[in-house]
Amino acid sequence: MSTIEESVKSIIAEQLGVKKEEVTNNASFVDDLGADSLDTVELVMALEEEFDTEIPDEEAEKITTVQAAIDFIKESKK
């Protein structure tokens, strides 16, 4: 597992108050991890801060799974 992947999963677990084991790559923030719209906004802000990147609103709306978040961060770091 890459460092980015581990970091993203840790942030998601912390922000959503779930066990790290529940944060699988294909987990949906809303359907699987119980996030609401405020949780997802706070999650995007936490990812932006941790990885010093900007996630535009139109991109943030597409980030609905753990893997989508990992992919976006990896792309932003290229």
Swiss-Prot record:
The gene is acpP. This is Acyl carrier protein. NCBIfam families: acyl_carrier, PRK00982.1-2, PRK00982.1-3, PRK00982.1-4, PRK00982.1-5. Pathway: Lipid metabolism; fatty acid biosynthesis. 4'-phosphopantetheine is transferred from CoA to a specific serine of apo-ACP by AcpS. This modification is essential for activity because fatty acids are bound in thioester linkage to the sulfhydryl of the prosthetic group. It comes from Wigglesworthia glossinidia brevipalpis. The lineage of its organism: Bacteria, Pseudomonadati, Pseudomonadota, Gammaproteobacteria, Enterobacterales. GO terms for biological process: lipid A biosynthetic process. InterPro entries: ACP, ACP-like_sf, PP-bd_ACP, Ppantetheine_attach_site. Residues 2-77 form the Carrier domain. The modification O-(pantetheine 4'-phosphoryl)serine is found at S37. Carrier of the growing fatty acid chain in fatty acid biosynthesis.
